[in-house]
């Protein structure tokens, strides 16, 4: 390696990285060093050059590590301090940019590998096949729909049973009121029957009294007739010669016939009245007895119907309680299953959202990295073109002799 030395100024520059291996470069000659002022990406670059002679040794590092070092022996009059610092800063920036590019490329590769692995793991496969979940969810939805329909039918049946029970209760209350009314009528008829019985007894007593009175009248009549006959017989014997006699037998016969006619008439009237009252009472008793029998039959039928309805109501209430318990158990079981499935779906959706957000973030980072890479490539190309142009220019210069 050739070495050139000058009196006063020397410079050291290095490109550092994070990679392993290095390339040693040795060169000598007179150079006009470029001084580059500009921003990232090579925009607004201005170049100035100064003649200098270098004695350098260096190494270019890879992505992970390494260094580029050089020793410059520069003429005091050929390279100013500002341009030397600018060149050193440019070398440092180039090295850091190269390190960043390679590190970002490697990180990008690792990220792509991770994304590919994640997609392979999260991709459709036997462990990530959600078709059976969809089928289970569809079956559960069908079962829930069926249970809802059955529940609606049961609720409708319960409402119908409740309406029927209310109807039967209304009928029972009506029939009960009718029964009470019939029983009240029966009690009234019994009182009427008792009154009629008392009236019949009274009439019988009146008839007996009339018969006794008639017998008494007959006896008195006979006694009066006997007394009159005895009186008339004495008068006839006394007055037989004075005046014509009165036909007392005829008078008595007429009186007797009149009394007999009156007694027979009274007897017939009393008997007719008694028979009419008895016939009327018998008719009323027969009618009321028939009504009582019909009412008793209706009450028996209603009691039997009420017992049947109460039994049916109890069975309907028992079936309602059993169906409500079954419905609550079914809703609880399917609610737990549905909540579990919803939790699984929510977990998958959260994972999918995280993956999408991660992919979006990685895309943004990748775009930023590609933008930085493109700008770095532009700066590297600009720097390389400048170095190649200056190197070609300096190679054409005469080589100074070593001192």
From Swiss-Prot:
Asymmetric dimethylarginine found at: 24
User: Region (Rod-like helical tail) spans which residues?
Assistant: 391-403
Query: Under the GO molecular function aspect, what terms does this record hold?
Result: protein-containing complex binding; structural constituent of muscle
Using the record's annotations, give every residue carrying the modification Phosphotyrosine. 394
Region annotated Coil 1A sits at: 83-118
Q: Where is this region: Head?
A: 1-82
Residue numbers bearing the Phosphoserine modification: 14, 22, 27, 35, 40, 57, 67, 75
Q: Where is this region: Linker 12?
A: 229-251
Q: Which UniProt keywords apply?
A: Coiled coil, Intermediate filament, Keratin, Methylation, Phosphoprotein
Note the superkingdom of the native organism. Eukaryota
Give me the ranges of the annotated region Linker 1. 119-136
Enumerate the residue ranges of region (Necessary for interaction with PNN). Answer: 247-393
What's a single GO CC term here?
Answer: Z disc
* Biological process, per Gene Ontology: cell differentiation involved in embryonic placenta development; Notch signaling pathway; response to estrogen; sarcomere organization
As stated in the Swiss-Prot or TrEMBL entry, residues carrying the post-translational modification Phosphothreonine are 326
* Domain IF rod residues, every copy: 83-394
Family, per entry: Belongs to the intermediate filament family.
The note filed under miscellaneous reads:
There are two types of cytoskeletal and microfibrillar keratin: I (acidic; 40-55 kDa) and II (neutral to basic; 56-70 kDa).
The record describes its quaternary structure and partners as:
Heterotetramer of two type I and two type II keratins. Interacts with PNN and the actin-binding domain of DMD.
Biological role stated in the UniProt entry: Involved in the organization of myofibers. Together with KRT8, helps to link the contractile apparatus to dystrophin at the costameres of striated muscle.
Instruction: Note what the entry says on domains.
Output: This keratin differs from all other IF proteins in lacking the C-terminal tail domain.
Q: What is this protein called?
A: Keratin, type I cytoskeletal 19
This chain's source organism reads Mus musculus (Mouse)
Annotated gene = Krt19
